[in-house]
């Protein structure tokens, strides 16, 4: 466990972000390939090949490939013609960013590929991804929107009460 830092976290320089993004991409690429290759080889050479297993392996490979490509696109650095760094791209290691969720998806899919070697019921673990996406959508978009609508409906009553109170005060002043 890392020791607690005192004070604010220091800001990262653009070159440091580019280097950390490269190492992060390399790590998650190696994780995806390191889990997918043995899982594919073992499942198709040792176990029975079914339509379900073929479909789930293709789906897993699509998830891994698209997640990695999304992270690579997101973190792409831009350089000037002279080779100077103009833009470091998005920081893949930023807490609370979308890259954190994409990395979780790669970890979930890689683990599912390996667990599916034990039992085909482990393919159901992939259902956690859309469940989490729905939960995040609910917490960040739908629920605040509904509570804002309810607050707007309650405000006219409060405004009417305040208006009556102000009217009474005005009458007393006259």
UniProtKB/Swiss-Prot annotation:
Residues 163-174 have a biased composition (Basic residues). Interacts with fz. InterPro entries: SND2/TMEM208. Disruption phenotype: Results in lethality and the few escapers show a significantly reduced life span as well as defective leg, eye and wing development. Exhibit PCP-like defects in the eyes and wings and display a modest but consistent ER stress response. It comes from Drosophila melanogaster. Its main location: endoplasmic reticulum. It is a multi-pass membrane protein. Residues 151-174 are annotated as: Disordered. Signal peptide: none annotated. GO terms for molecular function: signaling receptor binding. May play an important role during development and helps to maintain proper levels of Fz. It holds the Pfam family TMEM208_SND2. GO terms for cellular component: endoplasmic reticulum membrane; intracellular membrane-bounded organelle; vacuole. Expressed in the brain. It comes from the Eukaryota. This is Transmembrane protein 208. One of its GO terms (biological process) is protein localization involved in establishment of planar polarity. The keyword Nucleotide-binding does not apply. The keyword Lipid biosynthesis does not apply. The chain crosses the membrane at residues 30-50, 54-74, 111-131. It is found in: Endoplasmic reticulum membrane. Belongs to the TMEM208 family. Keywords: Endoplasmic reticulum, Membrane, Transmembrane, Transmembrane helix.
């Amino acid at each position: 466990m890392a020791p607690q830092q005192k004070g604010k976290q220091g800001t990262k320089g653009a070159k440091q972000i580019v280097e950390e993004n490269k190492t992060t991409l390399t790590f998650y690429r190696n994780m995806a390939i390191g889990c997918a290759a043995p899982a594919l080889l073992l499942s198709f050479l040792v176990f029975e090949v079914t339509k379900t297993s073929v479909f789930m392996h293709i789906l897993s490979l699509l998830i891994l490939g698209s997640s990695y490509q999304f992270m690579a696109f997101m973190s792409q650095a831009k350089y000037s013609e002279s080779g100077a760094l103009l833009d470091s791209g998005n920081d893949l290691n930023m807490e609370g960013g979308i890259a954190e969720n994409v990395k979780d998806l790669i970890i979930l899919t890689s683990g599912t590929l390996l667990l599916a070697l034990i039992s085909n019921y482990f393919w159901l673990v992939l259902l956690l991804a859309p469940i989490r996406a729905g939960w995040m959508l609910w917490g960040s978009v739908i629920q605040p929107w509904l509570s804002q609508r309810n607050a707007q409906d309650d405000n006219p009553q409060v405004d009417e009460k305040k208006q009556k109170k102000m009217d009474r005060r005005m009458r007393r002043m006259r």
